[in-house]
Amino acid sequence: MNLVDLWLTRSLSMCLLLQSFVLMILCFHSASMCPKGCLCSSSGGLNVTCSNANLKEIPRDLPPETVLLYLDSNQITSIPNEIFKDLHQLRVLNLSKNGIEFIDEHAFKGVAETLQTLDLSDNRIQSVHKNAFNNLKARARIANNPWHCDCTLQQVLRSMVSNHETAHNVICKTSVLDEHAGRPFLNAANDADLCNLPKKTTDYAMLVTMFGWFTMVISYVVYYVRQNQEDARRHLEYLKSLPSRQKKADEPDDISTVV
């Protein structure tokens, strides 16, 4: 083996050793940044698994290079504003089987355009801010939540790129129209535009108007009856006074007859 071959062999060995060392450092760095109660691995990008970890809130010390994040089967109740804003490489986010009730307006700011899969199924979500899913390009799963079907939900689903697939399994637990309760959202939306419904205030205005007219009619009837009673009383008194006046007028004739 000549010197050139020996040098190349040693150089290659050093490169492989250096590469292994760098990978070890990266793995150690990722492990050291792994949130408490979670498991982190570097298979195909940094995977952070926090499933069944009894978490009551989303960890705030998530590694910025996280690609897959599993937070399912915990006790998380809300998704705060900008909680994922530093996770620019995040592709998969699983928040299913929690107790999520509230999603803030800017909860997915920073990851809305890069996220590919979002799982919010099996939670307690009834409604969200109309801008909560703005620019979200992910395939979202939001089934098995007690959704209240109204104009806001209609706007939310329309703002999502994959809205038809997302809305397909949404069932209205309650609705602005009682007849839609228990029905799929798509059926309810096809039957009526939930953002163009007659306002109930119109019915109240009509009721107030009718009550006003009814009060006026009753008042007029009462006044009319009382007025007639008063006129009848006066007329009766007048009639009662007539005989006495007639008698006084006849008295001189009786006297002259006697004379």
UniProtKB/Swiss-Prot annotation:
<dbReference type="GO" id="GO:0031012">
    <property type="term" value="C:extracellular matrix"/>
</dbReference>
<keyword id="KW-0732">Signal</keyword>
<dbReference type="InterPro" id="IPR003591">
    <property type="entry name" value="Leu-rich_rpt_typical-subtyp"/>
</dbReference>
<dbReference type="Pfam" id="PF01462">
    <property type="entry name" value="LRRNT"/>
</dbReference>
<feature type="transmembrane region" description="Helical">
    <location>
        <begin position="205"/>
        <end position="225"/>
    </location>
</feature>
<dbReference type="GO" id="GO:0005615">
    <property type="term" value="C:extracellular space"/>
</dbReference>
<keyword id="KW-0472">Membrane</keyword>
<comment type="similarity">
    <text>Belongs to the LRRC3 family.</text>
</comment>
<dbReference type="InterPro" id="IPR001611">
    <property type="entry name" value="Leu-rich_rpt"/>
</dbReference>
<feature type="repeat" description="LRR 1">
    <location>
        <begin position="65"/>
        <end position="86"/>
    </location>
</feature>
<keyword id="KW-0325">Glycoprotein</keyword>
<keyword id="KW-0677">Repeat</keyword>
<feature type="domain" description="LRRCT">
    <location>
        <begin position="145"/>
        <end position="197"/>
    </location>
</feature>
<protein>
    <recommendedName>
        <fullName>Leucine-rich repeat-containing protein 3B</fullName>
    </recommendedName>
</protein>
<feature type="signal peptide">
    <location>
        <begin position="1"/>
        <end position="33"/>
    </location>
</feature>
<dbReference type="Pfam" id="PF00560">
    <property type="entry name" value="LRR_1"/>
</dbReference>
<feature type="domain" description="LRRNT">
    <location>
        <begin position="34"/>
        <end position="64"/>
    </location>
</feature>
<keyword id="KW-0812">Transmembrane</keyword>
<keyword id="KW-0433">Leucine-rich repeat</keyword>
<dbReference type="Pfam" id="PF13855">
    <property type="entry name" value="LRR_8"/>
</dbReference>
<feature type="repeat" description="LRR 2">
    <location>
        <begin position="89"/>
        <end position="110"/>
    </location>
</feature>
<keyword id="KW-1133">Transmembrane helix</keyword>
<dbReference type="InterPro" id="IPR000372">
    <property type="entry name" value="LRRNT"/>
</dbReference>
<feature type="repeat" description="LRR 3">
    <location>
        <begin position="114"/>
        <end position="135"/>
    </location>
</feature>
<feature type="glycosylation site" description="N-linked (GlcNAc...) asparagine">
    <location>
        <position position="47"/>
    </location>
</feature>
<feature type="glycosylation site" description="N-linked (GlcNAc...) asparagine">
    <location>
        <position position="94"/>
    </location>
</feature>
<dbReference type="GO" id="GO:0016020">
    <property type="term" value="C:membrane"/>
</dbReference>
<dbReference type="InterPro" id="IPR032675">
    <property type="entry name" value="LRR_dom_sf"/>
</dbReference>
